Swiss-Prot record:
E.C. numbers: 2.1.1.182
GO MF terms, alphabetically ordered: 16S rRNA (adenine(1518)-N(6)/adenine(1519)-N(6))-dimethyltransferase activity; RNA binding
Highest rank taxon of the organism: Bacteria
CDD domains reported for this sequence: AdoMet_MTases (cd02440)
Organismal lineage: Bacteria, Pseudomonadati, Bacteroidota, Bacteroidia, Bacteroidales
Location within or outside the cell: Cytoplasm
The protein, known as: Ribosomal RNA small subunit methyltransferase A
Amino acid sequence: MRLVKPKKALGQHFLKDLQIAQRIADTLDTFKSLPVLEIGPGMGVLTQFLLEAGHDLTVVELDMESVDYLNQNFPDLKGRIIAEDFLKLDLSKLFPGQFCVIGNYPYNISSQIFFKVLDYKDQIPCCSGMLQKEVAERLAAGPGSKTYGILSVLLQAWYDVEYLFTVSEKVFDPPPKVKSAVLKMTRNDRKELGCDEKLFKTVVKTSFNQRRKTLRNSMKPLLGKDCPDYALPIFDKRPEQLSMEQFVELTLISQKHLEKQAGDVL
């Protein structure tokens, strides 16, 4: 059986440990009624456990060598291998209803994968898998943590994020230079934020662009130098001190100011 050569340009680190693959597959045990999309299956170490568990599985794999391997070794995947870039897929065309996402995510695009999951949050009730330990810690971090950032806030607005366990670099081929971790995100019951969602994203991103400064300084690119709301106590804080609810409050303050500013121009 010819094995696939890992490609550095694609961020490929193939998982070798079957026990860990089984534990990752088990994170979707409560979602067996929904279709599953696996990102970056490589040589199918995780794939085999998802199929054994009876999941309605589709995989997306950019590496044609891996696609050939999967076609040869996983007959159950016939017609279910998408040889494309996950980041460019229109997922709503693939899945008209809800579906779950799982994978041993390519390390070079893991953050981009989660931003895309957010775009389909109403269709994706659960997303789990393996990524760099540092990124997993950042996604699961709470207010007050040095690792709390843009993705932490945006994901936790819509998902309960669980850091499940750490994985040694020794269980991969080739071994990455960093440790990995398994993360699980389960959609919370929030239907809306209570503010404009697009502006919420802009506010979060703007505030963290200068994370060491107080919001009074970091929000100037959006609100200008002389916003009268800077007198409010919330602007004394740094972005990592704010909860998701406080970011909603900050968004409402920003929206009011920007609408007034637009009205003054007219």
